[in-house]
């Protein structure tokens, strides 16, 4: 059985760079150098803990993807990557390569969809897949068998985490976010439906489809959801990860060979 380790690269790098930019506020070159060194240390620790047979780092594209084409306000207002870091990504990718880790960089697809595409066939064939990320959006993939490790908080984002955080099953998370929206992505949910109400509705009805089809007589919250059907369905589409992107390589290309 193979064990693929996936690094959500910018999720890791941007958090490291944020710390280093505070420690070297007036020196962008020092920020990048410190980010590079700290990233390498972090990745070495991750490799030692995970002991993978295969590994890849996945980077986001800067180009607008299908979500932006579908919904023009997608991720509006999000803090842009600092220019110095953007210009230094090639250096960081070279450092990863020296550690034995290739980088997947798409011109058109978001890292989240690329990761979901990597995960799907491997877990279906009983291979182990561990993702290093703090992004809770990946928890929608937990039922597939994916393991998610939050490196910074030293915790697993697993079924128990989802139950504690949301009171739901991983399979219900897409519908949960379709109701509440996701502010960090500027995805709108149903006005007046917060996390507690969304959890209650999904605990009772199971899925967004059942919520939209249910008899809403004498249930104002349900009426509210049904009045915002199109908002919910758009958010559901935007939140759900695509897992069918042609990648052009296979598992054997990702075999991890530690540097000599």
Curated annotation (Swiss-Prot):
Q: What note does UniProt attach to the cofactor annotation?
A: Binds 2 Mg(2+) per subunit. Only one magnesium ion has a direct interaction with the protein, the other interactions are indirect.
Instruction: List cofactor names only.
Output: Mg(2+); K(+)
| Positions of the 5'-3' exonuclease domain | 168-258
Instruction: Give me the ranges of the annotated region Interaction with DNA.
Output: 192-197
Name the Pfam families for this protein.
5_3_exonuc, 5_3_exonuc_N
Q: Which residues take part in binding K(+)?
A: 179, 190, 193
Q: Which SMART domains match?
A: 53EXOc, HhH2
Q: Which superkingdom? A: Bacteria
Summarize where Mg(2+) binds, as residue positions.
112
Cite a single GO BP annotation: DNA replication, Okazaki fragment processing
Keywords carried by this UniProt record:
DNA-binding, Endonuclease, Hydrolase, Magnesium, Metal-binding, Nuclease, Potassium
GO MF terms listed in the record are: 5'-3' exonuclease activity; 5'-flap endonuclease activity; DNA binding; magnesium ion binding; potassium ion binding
Q: Gene3D superfamilies this protein is in? A: 5' to 3' exonuclease, C-terminal subdomain, 5'-nuclease
UniProt cross-references to NCBIfam families, sorted A to Z: PRK09482.1
**Family of this protein:** Belongs to the Xni family.
Protein purpose: Has flap endonuclease activity. During DNA replication, flap endonucleases cleave the 5'-overhanging flap structure that is generated by displacement synthesis when DNA polymerase encounters the 5'-end of a downstream Okazaki fragment.
Name of protein: Flap endonuclease Xni
């Amino acid at each position: 059985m193979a064990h693929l380790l996936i690094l959500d690269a910018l999720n890791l790098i941007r958090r490291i760079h944020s710390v280093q930019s505070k420690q070297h506020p007036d020196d962008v070159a020092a920020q990048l150098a410190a980010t590079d060194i700290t990233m390498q240390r972090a990745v070495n620790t991750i490799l030692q803990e995970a002991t993978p047979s295969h590994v890849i780092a996945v980077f986001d594209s800067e180009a607008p993807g299908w979500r932006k084409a579908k919904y023009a306000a997608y991720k509006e207002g999000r803090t842009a990557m600092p220019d110095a870091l953007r210009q230094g990504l090639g250096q960081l990718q070279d450092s990863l390569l020296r550690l034995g880790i290739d980088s997947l960089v798409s011109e058109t697809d978001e890292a989240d969809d690329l990761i979901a595409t990597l995960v799907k066939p491997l877990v279906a064939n009983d291979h182990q897949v561990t993702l290093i990320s703090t992004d809770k959006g990946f928890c929608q993939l937990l039922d597939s068998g994916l393991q998610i490790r939050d490196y910074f908080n030293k915790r697993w984002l697993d079924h128990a985490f989802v139950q504690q955080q949301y009171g739901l099953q991983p399979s219900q998370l897409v519908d949960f976010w379709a109701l509440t929206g996701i502010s960090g992505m500027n995805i709108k949910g149903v006005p007046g439906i917060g996390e507690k109400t969304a959890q209650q509705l999904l605990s009772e009805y199971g899925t967004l489809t059942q919520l939209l089809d249910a008899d809403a007589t004498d249930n104002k919250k349900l009426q509210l959801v049904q009045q915002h059907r199109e908002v919910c369905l758009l958010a559901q589409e935007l939140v759900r990860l695509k897992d069918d992107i042609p990648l052009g390589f296979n598992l054997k290309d990702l075999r991890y060979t530690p540097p000599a």
